[in-house]
Design a protein with these regions (language model features):
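Glycine-rich, phosphate-binding/catalytic loops in enzymes
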Residues: 21-23, 66-69, 91-92, 161-165
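Loop-to-helix element that buttresses phosphate recognition and phosphoryl-transfer chemistry
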Residues: 4, 10-61, 115-129
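Active-site-adjacent alpha-helix immediately C-terminal to a catalytic or transition-state-stabilizing loop
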Residues: 59, 130-181
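Short amphipathic alpha-helical segments
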Residues: 17-18, 62-64, 157-160
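Short, basic/glycine-rich phosphate-binding loops at helix/coil junctions
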Residues: 15-18, 101-115
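Short coil-to-beta-strand
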Residues: 1-10, 101-104
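Phosphate-coordination/substrate-recognition cap region in phosphate-metabolizing enzymes
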Residues: 39-103
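Short coil/turn segments at beta-strand junctions that form active-site/ligand-binding loops
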Residues: 1, 46-48, 140-144
Length: 182
């Protein structure tokens, strides 16, 4: 099994510096073009199936990557981004000003992060781990496309490397439409 792990394309909120989480923001033209370009790059890969987060930005990215390929796309709730609770839709700098300790903890001491009506990182990682187990336990054993979100990719990477949650930010930067192959 080979998993082609992709972060969704650039969104409007990405360009505005807003926290997305479970709230959606549409792809920008750049996000669409980047997804199509990645699809062109991967055109010779014979995907058995595609898994995606249920959020529209990930679904759209998946469709643009696959183009006219007739591939089964399965949405899996376990591949949703971290639920940032009341921070969602807000600009990072505003959240930092209003919740300085929790903002600091999220980025510097993730094990101490206490979400405001959102999801703890340990809960999130267990959800992502279950999603990966769903893929591994699926009937597919060839090339699999998985389109999801930055923190999900970081979590999968850290899980694969047996890193604790406090090392989640020590993983590589995950840009929009980036590709990681497992």
């Amino acid at each position: 099994m080979r998993i082609y792990l992709v972060r969704h394309g650039e969104t409007i909120w990405n360009t505005e510096g807003r926290i997305q989480g479970w709230k959606n923001s549409n792809l920008t033209e750049k996000g669409i073009e980047d997804a199509k370009a990645l699809g062109k790059y991967l055109r010779d890969v014979d995907f058995q199936c595609a898994f995606t987060s249920p959020f529209q930005r990930a679904i759209d990215t998946t469709k643009f990557i696959l183009g006219d390929k007739n591939i089964v796309i399965t949405s899996n709730d376990n591949f949703r981004e971290l639920n940032f609770g009341t921070w969602e839709g807000r600009v990072f700098q505003d959240v930092k000003a209003e919740y300085p300790e929790q903002h600091y903890n999220l980025w510097n001491k993730p094990e101490a992060y206490i979400p405001v009506d959102g999801e703890y990182l340990e809960q999130f990682r267990e959800r992502v781990r279950q999603g990966i187990n769903d893929v591994i336990d699926s009937k597919y054993d060839g090339n699999i496309l998985l389109v999801t979100h930055a923190l999900v990719v970081k979590s999968i990477y850290s899980i694969a490397r047996n890193l604790p949650v406090d090392k989640i930010w020590d993983t590589p930067r995950i840009g929009n439409t980036s590709l990681t192959i497992l």
